[in-house]
UniProtKB/Swiss-Prot annotation:
Organism, as annotated: Dictyostelium discoideum (Social amoeba)
UniProt keyword annotation of Cytoplasm present: yes
Name of protein: Signal recognition particle subunit SRP72
One cellular-component annotation, GO: endoplasmic reticulum
Gene that encodes it: srp72
UniProt cross-references to Pfam families, sorted A to Z: SRP72 (PF08492), SRP_TPR_like (PF17004)
Membrane among keywords: no
Similarity comment: family membership: Belongs to the SRP72 family.
Extent of Low complexity compositional bias: 557-574
Subunit text: Component of a signal recognition particle (SRP) complex that consists of a 7SL RNA molecule and six protein subunits: srp72, srp68, srp54, srp19, srp14 and srp9.
TPR repeats: 9-42, 43-76, 78-104, 105-137, 140-173, 223-256, 269-302, 386-420, 421-454, 465-498, 522-555
PROSITE patterns listed in its UniProt record: TPR, TPR_REGION
Keywords associated with the record: Cytoplasm, Endoplasmic reticulum, Repeat, Ribonucleoprotein, RNA-binding, Signal recognition particle, TPR repeat
Cited function: Component of the signal recognition particle (SRP) complex, a ribonucleoprotein complex that mediates the cotranslational targeting of secretory and membrane proteins to the endoplasmic reticulum (ER). Binds the 7SL RNA in presence of srp68. This ribonucleoprotein complex might interact directly with the docking protein in the ER membrane and possibly participates in the elongation arrest function.
A GO BP entry: SRP-dependent cotranslational protein targeting to membrane
Amino acid sequence: MSKDTTVSLEQLFKELDEYIINSQFKKAIRVCNKILSVNGNDSEAFQCKVICLMQLSNFTEAIECFKKPEQIQSMQFEYSYCLYSTAKYQEALTQLEKQSSKETKSLELEAQIYYKLENYQKTISIYESLLSKPGYSDSIEFITNLCAVYLDAGKFNECQELLNKNKSQQTKTHELAFNSACLAISKNDTKTAETQLKLAKKICTDSLKKDGFSEEEIKEEQTSIDVQLGYVQQICGNLEKSLEQYQNVLEQQVGDSATLVATNNSISVRSILQSDQWSTQPKEYTHAMDSLKSLLTEAESTRLNSKQKKVINYNLCLLLVQLKKVSQCEELIKTLKSKYGQQQQQVDTSFVEDLDIIQVSLLIKEKKFKDAEKLLLKNNTTTGSIKSQLLLAQIYLLDNNNVAKALNVLEKLDSSVSLRPGIVATKVALYEKSGDLEKAVNSLDDLISIFDKQKKSEKDEEIYVNLLKASGNFKLKHHKYREASDMFDRVLKINPNDLIALPSYIVATSHFDPSLSQKYEGKLPNIKFESKIDIDLIEKYGLTFEKKLNLNEDSNSSSPTTTTTTTTKSTKPTATEVVKIKKSKKKLPKVMKPNYVPDPGRWLPKWQRANAKAARSKKNKDIIKGPQGIASASQTASLFVQESKNTNTNNNNTQSSKSEKPRNIHKKKSKK
């Protein structure tokens, strides 16, 4: 290499050094290209070019730079990171496995690749091995990542222990506060989740403002927090607030994974809030389905994990059911079962079970109850979820009202589920229908005894009181007066002025011990009437129905002929009087003819009616062929008779003029 080239290379490297220090990576790449044009084997220029491209996030262009295996060998970590950034996870993993001795940064990248491949067990094992090394236990970013992996793997206890060890760090970074909120959501602690999310949002705004970020950039960073806040409102039942939260995120058009989740969630919320509008306008369902399909395109699906994709596909199945596209729904269910049914994870089995429930609902609509029962029993026997078992009981009731089989399913439910108020109410109704009142009463008493043992909040106290009232009413209905009075007495001990339990207790005790009913008799409120009551009028109308019944009985027993008797009017009504209610006369139209019989063929055209046909036959009866001017044979005969009379009586008279005689009756006109 000549001296001039060496001097020029030294100058180029000085320029390259300045550009890299000043973070002018595009200019640095141009200098690298100049160096490589002079010396193509310069490893330093090649490495600088790759690093600059990675800094500019041009990972595909960086991968294209690696043309020789020696170049890949010299930069194995960088090459693997570029493959990871372009979503080529399997290639990146194989490249990392080729390394003989892995550095900590390679282990971190490997754990991140396993996380993207949703192999959470290997990710946790790598992170836990790194946790023992110096520097990692104090790293907030590393703790945040490990916490996220614990959440996705379903290891909530380990996540809670990790957060408890780093409580002080939760107020410093919004990512860790966000993960703490996600843990609270998984435990159904919505209040804690909401407070943690609001804390995360505040930390995010404060920290980014200090770093000089604009408001738009801060809002983009907060999209995941806003979507999670909307989800908390959704599971709490505040659908309008959650929809407003989702709409605010969608208006920003960030395009990250949180925005895709907001699109799916907003569709599910709108389908509930606007159900009446959607039922009358099927276009809403089709528009929603198109929006969900756009989320599953190749470009968008890389931002979603498999769990999120399952939820979107499940919502697509529900929309197809609403649109009555049964064949398309069945095809989608088959493809989803073949894709996720082979996996042995608990999430996948529950997802397949949800798909079975959709398929069963389609069979129920077609009244194929036996096929629906077989499908549920095939995959979900007694170990099935609550949804599938309750649906099986519903099928038994729909199929010839088989109460015994439905009760058999409900009785086999787990004790944590079988004593829920809704299921107990269903069992009581079915026991009552089957005539087994003892089991109905026992199931109510078991539920009440559970409430007696546990501590009750204000909401639980209200449920407990309503349960006591329902049990008392049921026992009162079936003449178990002592047991019913005990239920109402317990209600009155909680609230002595309960106006529902008070009269019910008096009614129940009056059947076996009237002295007990007098205990609360004085607490009954006095009835206040706005106006005076006419007792005679009440008695009068009260006896009307009884009198009508007596008259009906007398008419059935006596002969068809009836006799009427007149009685003198008294000032007070007696039992024999019947109050006659005056009925308004029916008003008839003035033009109405009472004896008029309408034509039965009035709905037909006139020429098709029977009377029109008779008139036509009568009219054509006398028509004959003859000369012009003569309508019928009777007319010609009368003319001949008249002529003969005139000739006989007036023989001596002169002939009448030609105008007085019929002209050429039998002559035909001759053609000229």
